[in-house]
């Protein structure tokens, strides 16, 4: 039986849930939807992208340790460039500028406060 497969929701390990929530909200434009330091987990979103932020105590039984790498697939080279410009104007920790890679991805990388990485990309192999 075929099922419509939903988007994955990555768990991002952080050391300070309140500081991480503020960074994702203020610098990267996410919304903190629920949770926080008291729960050890928070749900954040931006458009159709959803993620969980979790602190050390919450992760203790599960073994998810930083840093992690998350790929964010956008719909065009222009969207990648626009998001880079937006995040460059904030205090986002830009690791690399947008670049067309030999493997046919136009991408840049940003880090959070804990060194987790986000590679923002567009696959231009079919353009």
Where are these regions (language model features)?
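C-terminal "cap" of GNAT-fold acetyltransferases
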Residues: 2-7, 15, 38-51, 109
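Vicinal oxygen chelate
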Residues: 15-18, 70-117
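A short acidic/small-residue loop/turn micro-motif
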Residues: 40, 102-103, 124-127
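Short beta-strand-to-loop elements that line the ligand-binding cleft
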Residues: 10-12, 33-35, 99-100
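Conserved short beta-strand elements that form part of the metal-binding/catalytic scaffold
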Residues: 31-66, 117-122
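N-terminal beta-strand motif that seeds the catalytic metal site of vicinal oxygen chelate
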Residues: 1-21, 68-72, 123-127
């Amino acid at each position: 039986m075929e099922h419509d497969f939903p988007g994955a929701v990555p768990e991002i390990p952080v050391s300070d849930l309140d500081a991480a929530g503020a960074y994702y909200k203020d610098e990267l434009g996410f919304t903190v939807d629920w949770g926080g330091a008291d729960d050890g987990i928070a749900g954040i979103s931006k458009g159709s992208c959803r993620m969980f932020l979790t602190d050390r105590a919450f992760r203790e039984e599960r073994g998810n340790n930083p840093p992690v790498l998350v790929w964010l697939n956008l719909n065009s080279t222009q969207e990648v460039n626009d998001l880079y410009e937006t995040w460059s104007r904030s205090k986002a920790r830009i690791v690399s500028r947008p670049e067309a890679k030999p493997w046919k991805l136009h991408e840049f990388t940003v880090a959070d406060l804990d060194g987790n990485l986000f590679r923002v990309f567009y696959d231009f192999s079919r353009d």
